[in-house]
Amino acid sequence: MAIANKNIIFVAGLGGIGFDTSREIVKSGPKNLVILDRIENPAAIAELKALNPKVTVTFYPYDVTVPVAETTKLLKTIFDKLKTVDLLINGAGILDDYQIERTIAVNFTGTVNTTTAIMSFWDKRKGGPGGVIANICSVTGFNAIYQVPVYSASKAAALSFTNSLAKLAPITGVTAYSINPGITKTTLVHKFNSWLDVEPRVAELLLEHPTQTSLECAQNFVKAIEANQNGAIWKLDLGTLEAIEWTKHWDSHI
C-alpha cells in the first residue's frame, strides 16, 4: 500500500513509537492522518502539520476502553467527513503489570473493540469497501517476558486476534497484519512494574541488552505498511524488519 493520498486512522499515534511513526507516515504524504488518542497534545499535532503542510492532520480524543457503540459513533463522524478510510492502526498499549484489568482492557479488548466498530463501515457483507488493519502487538506475543506475564499475555492475545482477522479477509474484505516491536527505547520501558513485584529491576535489566530507537522502529513500520501483506507477522527488532513464520501445532480443520 502506497501511503500517498491515503486516509489513515492511527489509534495512539502520539505515543513513543506511535509519534515517530506518525512523523514517518506524514513524510510519505497521506491525504489525511486522523489521530485518536487519550490525551491531546497540540504541540505534537502542530509539529506533524508543519512537517508536511499538504497532509491534513486531525485529532479526536479517544479512550480504547469505551464501549463499542461509543467507538462506532466516533468512527461515523470520521467516515462522514472523509468518506473513505484506507488503513486503521491500533496502537494503544500500556506496560504495568500492577494494573491487570486495565492492561487487558487497553492492550487486547481495546484492539478488538476498535476493530469490531470499524467493521460496520468496512465489512463487504454490509456493502463496505474493505480496508486494512495494522495492529501493534509485541515480540512478547512470541515469547513472554515472564516477569510481566499479564502484559505478555495481552499481546499474545492481540497477535492471535490479528492472525484470525487475516484468515477472515475473504469473508469480510478486511485484511490485517501485526507489528511486533522488540525492546524499543521509549518512556514505556524506562520504568514499569512487574507482576507481584517478582522482579523490581525488570526495566533496568531489559535495557542492559541491545535495543532499538523508536525512529528505527517507525521507519520499519512504514515499510511494513507499504508491503501491505495480509497475515504478515512482522518482527521489528534491533532496527530490522522481518516477516516471521508462525509454527502450527494444531488445526481446527474448518
UniProtKB/Swiss-Prot annotation:
CDD domains: ADH_SDR_c_like. Substrate binds at S138. Keywords: NAD, Oxidoreductase. NAD(+) binds at residues 10-33. InterPro entries: ADH_Drosophila-type, NAD(P)-bd_dom_sf, Sc_DH/Rdtase_CS, SDR_fam. One of its GO terms (molecular function) is alcohol dehydrogenase (NAD+) activity. GO terms for cellular component: cytoplasm. It catalyses: a primary alcohol + NAD(+) = an aldehyde + NADH + H(+); a secondary alcohol + NAD(+) = a ketone + NADH + H(+). GO terms for biological process: alcohol metabolic process. Signal peptide: none annotated. The active site is at Y151 (proton acceptor). Homodimer. This is Alcohol dehydrogenase 1. It comes from Drosophila navojoa (Fruit fly).
